[in-house]
């Protein structure tokens, strides 16, 4: 080869190499080279970068789908590394070490969670990455729609609201966030007025809207959605923390199918010490019982994916945290404007999207923490009823299945739902399917856990101890209270059953206070072979709440391998090593169904 040609080839090779190796530096915001926020344990306010400012750590590898669509890794590896190095109060989602002085009721009174603790944790605190390990290697579409993030609030705590905003800014690719819209539902706390305006002026992507009167959560969300400019609307609550790479997995599913509503996995931020952890059972399908309480049920084997980090269908959303294509949201009519304050809206939007041509998914690789309040700290305006909202949803969407609700809540039957003609017309114009279709094709696994027609109970009435002649009694105990042994009121000839001594051994193989038609929502629960028997929220998942009533009259607890026993001297009811000859371990139900009991024991 001649020298001139050789030099030319070398020059071309150098140019090509330079093009390959040239860093792809995007206009990414600095993660948190921040000014101090004045809170212990962390750096402060997120600050918008100067134009053109970027980070070499944001460089991404690009992959390709078979149809030519580009995929890329959206993780901010440098930000993740910095988060891993953070130490201080609440960092890595660890519990704040509370003192007795910080546990006082005053700390919870205004917000329903401990605002003293919240104020001592950095607004930019780090969170544990509790996603499935497969999420680390997932790639999403390189070109994704942007989103308006709508955060409604009413008298929210300062640090909890700001931490919500900071977590979104810190853990979202800036080009995917069209705006963050804070919608103030007529708050009257001073820190949410000019101080909030001044603080949020630091962030060009954040704006604040304010209602002129108390509208409630539902209509406040609608106000935010009405001014949104993003391709997608993402709703969050005002006391959340977005976790690592939470946004691209949501937007990717909508980019592939605009009629998909997507929900992040909702983790729990403890209302006392702000520890961050998964919900019990983690990935589960959203459901409801026939009193319209939200429930979670296991993913059935038929729907389980080979990769547990893949999205999965869910019949019903939890409510406050989801993303939806903006145009699709309005094609569906948004929320029913006749729904008041809050409650029932998650059912309305869930039924609507499934029955009217869309779908809904939970996204395991998108996680957002949420503070579940100890109690609701504000009053619902006079005349507003959650029951009315539920009746309205039932009348518009549930067809003949509404009757199952009215059977359990007879007070709903004659309650006015207001004028639903417009909503029924919307349903007709969208050519929506029937609720029977929804129950048959989408929520087909729900009746296994919450059947419309309650199967017969195995036993009910008083539970009398053979050895002592005394009865199990709740003593009007609150959740978590131990069951007690007391004199049997039926034996004293009282005219009516004492509600504290009436129990039902249900078809779920749990034992609940109340007669078969009116059972309560808490169950006999035991955690070990020596523990007291306590009343705990019924979860319908067996486990600690599974009981067997055997032919020898013992109440056997399979998880602990022990039997329910009692002590007459101190009125305790507790678990003990099974001894069929012990009369204090033998119990008599007032009424039994031998067919059901035989089935239980056979299983």
From Swiss-Prot:
<keyword id="KW-0472">Membrane</keyword>
<dbReference type="InterPro" id="IPR035992">
    <property type="entry name" value="Ricin_B-like_lectins"/>
</dbReference>
<dbReference type="InterPro" id="IPR001173">
    <property type="entry name" value="Glyco_trans_2-like"/>
</dbReference>
<feature type="domain" description="Ricin B-type lectin">
    <location>
        <begin position="458"/>
        <end position="590"/>
    </location>
</feature>
<dbReference type="GO" id="GO:0016266">
    <property type="term" value="P:O-glycan processing"/>
</dbReference>
<feature type="binding site">
    <location>
        <position position="237"/>
    </location>
    <ligand>
        <name>Mn(2+)</name>
    </ligand>
</feature>
<dbReference type="Pfam" id="PF00652">
    <property type="entry name" value="Ricin_B_lectin"/>
</dbReference>
<comment type="pathway">
    <text>Protein modification; protein glycosylation.</text>
</comment>
<dbReference type="InterPro" id="IPR045885">
    <property type="entry name" value="GalNAc-T"/>
</dbReference>
<feature type="region of interest" description="Flexible loop">
    <location>
        <begin position="373"/>
        <end position="384"/>
    </location>
</feature>
<feature type="transmembrane region" description="Helical; Signal-anchor for type II membrane protein">
    <location>
        <begin position="12"/>
        <end position="31"/>
    </location>
</feature>
<feature type="region of interest" description="Disordered">
    <location>
        <begin position="38"/>
        <end position="59"/>
    </location>
</feature>
<dbReference type="Pfam" id="PF00535">
    <property type="entry name" value="Glycos_transf_2"/>
</dbReference>
<feature type="binding site">
    <location>
        <position position="214"/>
    </location>
    <ligand>
        <name>substrate</name>
    </ligand>
</feature>
<keyword id="KW-0333">Golgi apparatus</keyword>
<dbReference type="GO" id="GO:0000139">
    <property type="term" value="C:Golgi membrane"/>
</dbReference>
<feature type="binding site">
    <location>
        <position position="238"/>
    </location>
    <ligand>
        <name>substrate</name>
    </ligand>
</feature>
<feature type="topological domain" description="Lumenal">
    <location>
        <begin position="32"/>
        <end position="603"/>
    </location>
</feature>
<protein>
    <recommendedName>
        <fullName>Polypeptide N-acetylgalactosaminyltransferase 10</fullName>
        <ecNumber>2.4.1.41</ecNumber>
    </recommendedName>
</protein>
<keyword id="KW-1015">Disulfide bond</keyword>
<keyword id="KW-0325">Glycoprotein</keyword>
<dbReference type="InterPro" id="IPR000772">
    <property type="entry name" value="Ricin_B_lectin"/>
</dbReference>
<dbReference type="InterPro" id="IPR029044">
    <property type="entry name" value="Nucleotide-diphossugar_trans"/>
</dbReference>
<feature type="binding site">
    <location>
        <position position="373"/>
    </location>
    <ligand>
        <name>substrate</name>
    </ligand>
</feature>
<dbReference type="GO" id="GO:0006493">
    <property type="term" value="P:protein O-linked glycosylation"/>
</dbReference>
<feature type="binding site">
    <location>
        <position position="239"/>
    </location>
    <ligand>
        <name>Mn(2+)</name>
    </ligand>
</feature>
<feature type="glycosylation site" description="N-linked (GlcNAc...) asparagine">
    <location>
        <position position="593"/>
    </location>
</feature>
<feature type="compositionally biased region" description="Low complexity">
    <location>
        <begin position="45"/>
        <end position="55"/>
    </location>
</feature>
<feature type="region of interest" description="Catalytic subdomain A">
    <location>
        <begin position="144"/>
        <end position="253"/>
    </location>
</feature>
<dbReference type="GO" id="GO:0046872">
    <property type="term" value="F:metal ion binding"/>
</dbReference>
<feature type="disulfide bond">
    <location>
        <begin position="135"/>
        <end position="365"/>
    </location>
</feature>
<feature type="region of interest" description="Catalytic subdomain B">
    <location>
        <begin position="311"/>
        <end position="373"/>
    </location>
</feature>
<feature type="binding site">
    <location>
        <position position="154"/>
    </location>
    <ligand>
        <name>substrate</name>
    </ligand>
</feature>
<keyword id="KW-0479">Metal-binding</keyword>
<comment type="similarity">
    <text>Belongs to the glycosyltransferase 2 family. GalNAc-T subfamily.</text>
</comment>
<keyword id="KW-0430">Lectin</keyword>
<feature type="binding site">
    <location>
        <position position="378"/>
    </location>
    <ligand>
        <name>substrate</name>
    </ligand>
</feature>
<keyword id="KW-0812">Transmembrane</keyword>
<feature type="disulfide bond">
    <location>
        <begin position="563"/>
        <end position="578"/>
    </location>
</feature>
<feature type="binding site">
    <location>
        <position position="185"/>
    </location>
    <ligand>
        <name>substrate</name>
    </ligand>
</feature>
<keyword id="KW-0464">Manganese</keyword>
<feature type="glycosylation site" description="N-linked (GlcNAc...) asparagine">
    <location>
        <position position="124"/>
    </location>
</feature>
């Amino acid at each position: 080869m001649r020298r001139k040609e050789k030099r030319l080839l070398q020059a071309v090779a150098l140019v090509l190499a330079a093009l390959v190796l040239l860093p792809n530096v995007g206009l990414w915001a600095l993660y948190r080279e921040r000014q101090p926020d004045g809170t212990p344990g962390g750096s402060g306010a997120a600050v918008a970068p100067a134009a053109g400012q970027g980070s070499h750590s944001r460089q991404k590898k690009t992959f390709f789908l078979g149809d030519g669509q580009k995929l890329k890794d959206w993780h901010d590896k440098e930000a993740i590394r910095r988060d891993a190095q953070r130490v201080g109060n609440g960092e890595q989602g660890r519990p704040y070490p509370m003192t007795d002085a910080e546990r006082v009721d005053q700390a919870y009174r205004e917000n329903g969670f401990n605002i003293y603790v919240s104020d001592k944790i950095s607004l930019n605190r780090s969170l544990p990455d509790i996603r499935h390990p497969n999420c680390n290697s997932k790639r999403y579409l390189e070109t994704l729609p942007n989103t308006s993030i709508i955060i409604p609030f009413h008298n929210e705590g300062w640090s909890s609201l700001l931490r919500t905003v900071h977590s979104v800014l810190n853990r979202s690719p800036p080009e995917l966030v069209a705006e963050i819209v804070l919608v103030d539902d007529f708050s009257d706390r001073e820190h949410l007025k000019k101080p909030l305006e001044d603080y949020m002026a630091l962030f060009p992507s954040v704006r604040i809207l304010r209602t002129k009167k108390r509208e409630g959560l539902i209509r406040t969300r609608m106000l935010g959605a009405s001014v949104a400019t993003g391709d997608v609307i993402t709703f969050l609550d005002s006391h959340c923390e977005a976790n690592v790479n939470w946004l691209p997995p949501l937007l990717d599913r909508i980019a592939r199918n605009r009629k998909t509503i997507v929900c992040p996995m909702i983790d729990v931020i403890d209302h006392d010490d702000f520890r961050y952890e998964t919900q019990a059972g983690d990935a589960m399908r959203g459901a409801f019982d026939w009193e319209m309480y939200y429930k979670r049920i296991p993913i059935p084997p038929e729907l389980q994916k080979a990769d547990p980090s893949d999205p999965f269908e869910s019949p019903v959303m939890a409510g406050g945290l989801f993303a939806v294509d903006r145009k699709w949201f309005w094609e569906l009519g948004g929320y029913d404007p006749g729904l008041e304050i809050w409650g029932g809206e998650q059912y309305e939007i869930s039924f609507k999207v499934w029955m009217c041509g869309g779908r809904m998914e939970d996204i395991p690789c998108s996680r957002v923490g949420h503070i579940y309040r100890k109690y609701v700290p504000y009053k619902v305006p006079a005349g507003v009823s959650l029951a009315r909202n539920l009746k309205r949803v039932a009348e518009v969407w549930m067809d003949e299945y509404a009757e199952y609700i009215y059977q359990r809540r007879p007070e709903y039957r004659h309650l006015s739902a207001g004028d639903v003609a417009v909503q029924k017309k919307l349903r007709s114009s969208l050519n929506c399917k029937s609720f029977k279709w929804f129950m048959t094709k989408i929520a087909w696994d729900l009746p296994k856990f919450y059947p419309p027609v309650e199967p017969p109970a195995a036993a009910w009435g008083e539970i009398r101890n053979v050895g002592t002649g005394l009865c199990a009694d709740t003593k009007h105990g609150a959740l978590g209270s131990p069951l007690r042994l007391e004199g049997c009121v039926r034996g004293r000839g009282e005219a009516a059953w004492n509600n504290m001594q009436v129990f039902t051994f249900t078809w779920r193989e749990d034992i609940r206070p109340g007669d078969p038609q009116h059972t309560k929502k808490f169950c006999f629960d035991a955690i070990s072979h020596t523990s007291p028997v306590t009343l705990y929220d019924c979860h319908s998942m067996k486990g600690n709440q599974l009981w067997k009533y055997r032919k020898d009259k013992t109440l056997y607890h399979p998880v602990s391998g022990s039997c329910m026993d009692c002590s007459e001297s101190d009125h305790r009811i507790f678990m003990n090593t099974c001894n069929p000859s012990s009369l204090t371990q033998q119990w008599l139900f007032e009424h039994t169904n031998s067919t059901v009991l035989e089935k239980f024991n056979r299983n």
